[in-house]
Amino acid sequence: MEHTYQHAWIIPFAPLPFTMSIGLGLLLVPTATKNLRRMWTFPSVSLLSIAMVFSVNLSIQQINGSSIYQHLWSWTINNDFSFEFGHLIDPLTSIMSILITTVGIMVLIYSDNYMSHDQGYLRFFAYMSFSNTSMLGLVTSSNLIQIYIFWELVGMCSYLLIGFWFTRPTAANACQKAFVTNRVGDFGLLLGILGFYWITGSFEFRDLFEIFTNLIHNNGVNSLFATLCAFLLFVGAVAKSAQFPLHVWLPDAMEGPTPISALIHAATMVAAGIFLVARLLPLFTVIPYIMNLISLIGVITLLLGATLALAQRDIKRSLAYSTMSQLGYIMLAPGIGSYRAALFHLITHAYSKALLFLGSGSIIHSMEPIVGYSPDKSQNVVLMGGLTKYLPITKTTFLLGTLSLCGIPPLACFWSKDEILNDSWLYSPIFAIIACSTAGLTAFYMVRVYLLTFDGHLHVHFQNYSGTRNSSFYSISIWGKEGTKFVNGNLPLSTLKPNKISFFSKKISNKMDGNVGNRIRSFSFRIRFDNKETFVYPHESDNTMLLPLLGLVLFTLFVGSVGIPFDQGGTEFDILSKWLNPSINLLHPNSNVSVDWYEFGTNAIYSVSIACFGIFIASLFYGSIYSSFQNLDFINSFVKKPGSKRIFLDRIINVIYNWSYNRGYIDVFYTTCFTKGIRGLAELTYLLDRRLIDGIANGIGMASFFVGEGIKYVGGGRISSYLFVYLSYVSILLLIYYFYFFSFLF
């Protein structure tokens, strides 16, 4: 066992040789390296697999032995200061290592086909491998300085990956936005690290926890300063994990390739903030104000993310806001003291969200030949629909990921989310009500995305899509209400030109006749090239892209079992609790792992009922075209209200839609207050500099010039004249001094 722990340093550095090899290959033999670029996938996957094998081995030993291991090397700078660096292996490290390596392997295999035609193929794999190295280095760090170093490397890799297609202005702006937003958190993290070093004199976790806890209990440190330092550490996690109010970078990060979105949203960047909170939780637990703040930020984020996901048209942005909401659940859990539930949901959500993002990549891959390669078209759910026939495997995997995120048993997220909901009732009923209500919203927006993508018929055919922003599909409301022909207006969904049918209309002017099915029986798209017509069909992805989806399906189905209690010698225990036993004992020495199955069943029925209600409402509004028309009278019986009641209902729907589609106006607020405010301040500073500062300096120079020009005519060039003037002035000064001195005496 000791031998295995000593060589755990291999885990973070295993993927690094691949990145270095690509760099050397492109530098020394660029032509050969580019010609053999598809062969580079194998070493990248192989090296990350080595790290995965080490991680699994360490995890098995920890489950059996329940030990924490730390190996350090001392670096002496001078006689008064030495820095120790090394690796820390505990349950949190092993969980994160397995998560990063397994998701990373799936994403790398998937990317081989997804990025095969991209000119930046090698650059993409180099960035991905270095990102895995940075994240693995972060989770194995033994002190705050190492964490900060790898924290910055993770941020740099995310910047490079988000802006991978840097020639696109939107991608360039997105990576800059992510970078600048995370600078706020990184600056706070650095100040917090320095503050705690000033308090405790140590960067090592165990020394830091013990010294700080003793100081707090003995009133040996100013509580306000300690709270401020802890808050600054938490600010770093808020920015990295896209928590309110530093969440604005997350939806724009979708400008990168889809495999990058899967990696960032599942196992790397957003997980880094959660990891930091989990790692430093012994610090936070002795400061009640910080624990309350963590839970409050988590609740705000989970509700805000869910509401912003309701009306998004971009499939990846919908999943991005879903990630934000689920990270709010994960952040809420440690804030209420539920350390186990936080890590459990981090695991289950990572695999489910990676499955959904890779599934969305398969969908986008099939839509691009039809609507074009612009993200505004290929990722727009308004143009999708009816893909079940052509993407059956992708559809099945996406459905399982959707149901898992909705919290439907026995899929993975059901077990973890239900545990967070149960624990939230013990902490605060208000937080619990918000969390449970958001679970219904989660089911609604996830099923909405699924139905718009796979159900019914290909929507592009109903809109006579022309590929321009003036196409009629922009006048269709996803809320079932006919809207104006503006991009930011209300968007309906199910209409047939020229007769429009609304779920909120007073009467149905036209019924769908039986010939409609014949007219749209073929889901092909007709494109004209040089007076020739070519038919393009949606198609299922290649096996290289489907294999990772199937692998993630297995995780989504079975990874929840690690947290299900089982009977072991008369006591109920689960693998995750046994895995986390040292950490749980460190945080809660008297923790009880017994399970009340009756209470669990009651709470599960309640949470599943909320999810089913959300699924039902989504199916009511976004079901297939045939079922929508067949049930139109039924739907209208609910939503058709006479006079002022209907107007009031429409206004509520418009407010919800505008709030969601415009991202809660938070981006507008930041743009107005910060971007425009800073530009206005810069213009004012420029004006003051040019008019005031430069005016004073230039004015003195001009005054000297004119004075010199005026007095140069006084002199005639005769020395006697200069002496006369000189003596005259001296005489005048002497007279003034004489009269002033004597007048002062007498």
Curated annotation (Swiss-Prot):
Single GO term (MF): NADH dehydrogenase (ubiquinone) activity
Catalytic reactions on record: a plastoquinone + NADH + (n+1) H(+)(in) = a plastoquinol + NAD(+) + n H(+)(out); a plastoquinone + NADPH + (n+1) H(+)(in) = a plastoquinol + NADP(+) + n H(+)(out)
What Gene3D superfamilies is this protein classified in? Answer: 1.20.5.2700
Question: Might you name a Gene Ontology BP term for this protein?
Answer: electron transport coupled proton transport
Under Enzyme Commission nomenclature, its number is 7.1.1.-
> GO CC terms for this protein?
chloroplast thylakoid membrane
Q: Primary place of residence?
A: plastid
Tell me which UniProt keywords the record has, alphabetically.
Answer: Chloroplast, Membrane, NAD, NADP, Plastid, Plastoquinone, Quinone, Thylakoid, Translocase, Transmembrane, Transmembrane helix, Transport
Q: How does it sit in the membrane?
A: Multi-pass membrane protein
Quaternary structure, per UniProt, is: NDH is composed of at least 16 different subunits, 5 of which are encoded in the nucleus.
Report the protein name in the record.
Answer: NAD(P)H-quinone oxidoreductase subunit 5, chloroplastic
Species this chain originates from: Calycanthus floridus var. glaucus (Eastern sweetshrub)
